[in-house]
């Protein structure tokens, strides 16, 4: 073959393959010094330059269909020599071929003759697959999750709450909100009634009333109507969130209303005590007057009897006077 000038593409590919296979065999001999590849020599180096062995064809196919990251083999320079078999061609290999072989050594080793390394990698991969996907792996994953859940519970003391308890919480919130609304309504009603009672008209007389009797009957419809409207207007889920929001928002208002309610209750109790004392005083006056009336009635009865006696005496005296006049008239004759 010519030593310089333009060379055909077939000879260039053949020389590159021969150099690549020689280097591969050398690397395989370094990895497995006792293997059959080191003692058998290089069968591809003995083949003629014009003919391609099956292994060479496989190598070319693997090189052409290699990974995307591997660099394409560069053609040697026109002045490069075109013959050299064996290990002597390794130093003269093109830099492009070295780069390609360095970037994909694993693909070259796997595509060659079936060696001991490929045989060892297959059971290893099978073992790894068996470890990753099997009942033991699922069991280990479940144990890890249980351990994490235990650690969470241990650190915080919080247990997962089922949905039923959440619904119970919402219902409790609704009940508490209804009670607060009812108390607020009763408080407002009591304040209105007490203000109306403490400011009577000057021309009218003051009559004490019991607020416990008058309040429920008068304001029963007003307290029950908003609850019915809320229950009809909002579903259960909306009412739960609405009640919780209102409870958080009306917390200071409820505290102030409770304090005012307590003060109002104390004032009402004092007022009730005063009214009871006044009532007792009036009852005593009425009893005294009734006693006086009874005594006066007895005196009137006595006077009526005396009057009757005096009328009888007067009639008797009139009769006596008539008789005396008759006697005197007879005597004068």
UniProtKB/Swiss-Prot annotation:
Q: How is it modified after translation?
A: Preferentially phosphorylated at the Thr-156 by PKC in cancer cells.
Where along the sequence do coiled-coil regions lie? 255-333
Compartments, as annotated in UniProt: Cytoplasm; Nucleus
Biased segments, Low complexity type = 1-14, 33-51, 66-80, 105-116
Which residue intervals make up region (Selective for apoptosis induction in cancer cells (SAC))? 138-196
User: Any keyword Transcription regulation?
Assistant: yes
PTM Phosphoserine: at which residues?
A: 224
Q: Name one GO cellular component term.
A: chromatin
Compositional bias annotation for Polar residues: 186-196
Q: Does the keyword Transport apply?
A: no
- Disordered, as annotated region: 1-262
GO MF, any single term: leucine zipper domain binding
- Give the GO biological process terms: apoptotic signaling pathway; negative regulation of B cell proliferation; negative regulation of epithelial to mesenchymal transition; negative regulation of fibroblast proliferation; negative regulation of gene expression; negative regulation of T cell proliferation; negative regulation of T cell receptor signaling pathway; negative regulation of transcription by RNA polymerase II
Residue ranges annotated as compositionally biased, kind Basic and acidic residues, are: 175-185, 235-248
Motif B30.2/SPRY domain-binding motif, residue range(s) on this chain: 62-66
**Signal peptide interval:** none
Q: Which domain of life is it from?
A: Eukaryota
Free-text domain note: The leucine-zipper domain is not essential for apoptosis, but is required for sensitization of cells to exogenous apoptotic insults and for interaction with its partners. The SAC domain is a death-inducing domain selective for apoptosis induction in cancer cells. This domain is essential for nuclear entry, Fas activation, inhibition of NF-kappa-B activity and induction of apoptosis in cancer cells.
Extra info from the record?
The synapses are crucial cellular sites for the cell death promoting actions of PAWR in motor neurons. Targeted inhibition of PAWR by RNAi is neuroprotective.
> What assembly does the database describe for this protein?
Homooligomer. Interacts (via the C-terminal region) with WT1. Interacts with THAP1. Interacts with AATF. Interacts with BACE1. Interacts with SPSB1 (via B30.2/SPRY domain); this interaction is direct and occurs in association with the Elongin BC complex. Interacts with SPSB2 (via B30.2/SPRY domain); this interaction occurs in association with the Elongin BC complex. Interacts with SPSB4 (via B30.2/SPRY domain); this interaction occurs in association with the Elongin BC complex. Component of a ternary complex composed of SQSTM1 and PRKCZ. Interacts with actin.
- Name of this protein: PRKC apoptosis WT1 regulator protein
Q: Which species is this record about? A: Mus musculus (Mouse)
Q: Which gene encodes it?
A: Pawr
């Amino acid at each position: 073959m010519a030593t310089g000038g333009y060379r055909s593409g077939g000879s260039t590919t053949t020389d590159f393959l021969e150099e690549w296979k020689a280097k591969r065999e050398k690397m395989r001999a370094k990895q497995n010094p006792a293997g059959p590849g080191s003692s058998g020599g290089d069968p591809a180096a003995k083949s003629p330059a014009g003919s391609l062995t099956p292994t060479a064809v496989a190598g070319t196919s693997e090189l052409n269909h290699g990974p995307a990251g591997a660099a394409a083999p560069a053609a040697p320079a026109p002045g490069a020599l075109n013959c050299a078999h064996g290990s002597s061609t390794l130093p003269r290999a093109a830099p492009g071929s070295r780069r390609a072989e360095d970037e994909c050594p694993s693909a070259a080793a796997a595509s060659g003759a079936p060696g001991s390394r490929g045989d060892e990698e297959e059971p290893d991969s099978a073992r790894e697959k068996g470890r990753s996907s099997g009942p033991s792996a699922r069991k280990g994953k479940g144990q890890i999750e249980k351990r994490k859940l235990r650690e969470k519970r241990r650190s915080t003391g919080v247990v997962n709450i089922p949905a039923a308890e959440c619904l119970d919480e919402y219902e409790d919130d609704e009940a508490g909100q209804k009670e607060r609304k009812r108390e607020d309504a009763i408080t407002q009603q009591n304040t209105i009634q007490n203000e109306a009672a403490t400011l009577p008209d000057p021309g009218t007389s003051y009559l004490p009333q019991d607020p416990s009797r008058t309040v429920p009957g008068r304001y029963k419809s007003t307290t029950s109507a908003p609850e019915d409207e809320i229950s009809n207007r909002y579903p259960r889920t909306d009412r739960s969130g609405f009640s919780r929001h209102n409870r958080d928002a009306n917390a200071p208002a409820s505290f102030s209303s409770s304090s005012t309610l307590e003060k109002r209750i104390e004032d009402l109790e004092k007022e009730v005590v005063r009214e009871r004392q006044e009532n007792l005083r009036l009852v005593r006056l009425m009893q005294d007057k009734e006693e006086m009336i009874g005594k006066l009635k007895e005196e009137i009865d006595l006077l009526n009897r005396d009057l009757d006696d005096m009328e009888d005496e007067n009639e008797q005296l009139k009769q006596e006077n008539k008789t005396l006049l008759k006697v005197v008239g007879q005597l004068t004759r």
